Amino acid sequence: MIRVNLIARDNGFGLSRNLHLLHDALTAADFEVTVSGIRRGALRKILHPARLRARTLARRLAGRGPQRWDVNLMLERVRPEYLATARRNVLLPHPEWFDQRDRKWLPRLDRAFVLTRHAVPIFESLGLQTEYTGFTSEDRRDPSVPREHAFFHLAGRSANKGTETLLATWRHHPGWPRLTVLQSPRAARETVQASNITHRVGYIADAELKRIQNAHRFHLCPSETEGFGHYLVEAMGVGAVVATLDAPPMNEMVTRERGALIAPARTGTQSLATTYFYDEAALEHAVERLLSTSDDELERMGTAARTWFEDNDRAFKSRIAEAVRALAA
């Protein structure tokens, strides 16, 4: 049985979710999977590498060889203390969070598995042998929840979701349907008050979040950039009509056939990623188009989004298993 070690900072948010999804996908494909969740702390930075070196030495002395695993999968960051613990080392990077300090370790890697097609040339340009595996998201669909002709924006704690422009635009359109925004207190500058805006700043139970996701026909996800885009993909999974930026990698997931695209007005950069920003006029155009779309067409778009979600989930699980097997052979 092929032994795989998943390595990432267990932050309780996106990386923890990725660890869980990868663990389930690889376990279902008959791999022996270990999760090495890394915690923050100055003491950990000293003690953890020392423990790994001691364990590696003990394996050598016992005649078992230094490599406990066949493949290390490192999420987002290169973890050099683990390089000697596996026969093959792989990075699953996010362009927008790539740390330049990791460049010196790239020659030690056997492969990069990237989550979007947009990321392939980015990491090939760094000299990495790069393979598109894609990714998946949790299936949040609950067909028992009645759907409302309303809009939802899951801002969370991210500063890359285009939330401020969204709220400002909605305030100028009191005749638009209700917009519900969920945002972390760490990210919210203020709580917006308007007759057709419900701005919830704080944390809610996951069951309530799932209900809200399923209850809204429209999900607004105008991200500046995404490593993959769980909140876009979860929205498609519940059969919502999703609006996002007409820019990579967001428009890999959302197309006009299964959602709405917002034209970017300007660009910027964040690490290796290009960031995209929209203006009020572009959002107005996209929202008005959705509001003028028939219910039958909206239902068709939501069904197409759900179909894409299911197809993508199956394809990812097949690709990641095949990629790991080929590398470990």
Feature map (PLM): residue ranges:
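Donor nucleotide-sugar binding/catalytic pocket of nucleotide-sugar-dependent glycosyltransferases
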Residues: 110-141
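N-terminal pre-catalytic "stem/leader" segment of glycosyltransferase-like enzymes
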Residues: 1-75, 314
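Nucleotide-activated donor-binding/catalytic signature segment of Leloir-type glycosyltransferases, i.e.
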Residues: 187-210, 218
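Aromatic "clamp/platform" in nucleotide-sugar-dependent glycosyltransferases that forms part
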Residues: 224
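Extended catalytic core of nucleotide-activated donor transferases of GT-like folds
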Residues: 42-122
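A charged, aromatic-enriched C-terminal amphipathic alpha-helix characteristic of glycosyltransferases
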Residues: 140, 282, 291-325
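Conserved donor-binding/catalytic core segment of Leloir-type glycosyltransferases
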Residues: 142-161, 167-171, 179-180
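Short hydrophobic beta-strand element within catalytic cores of glycosyltransferases
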Residues: 241-244, 249-254, 260-261
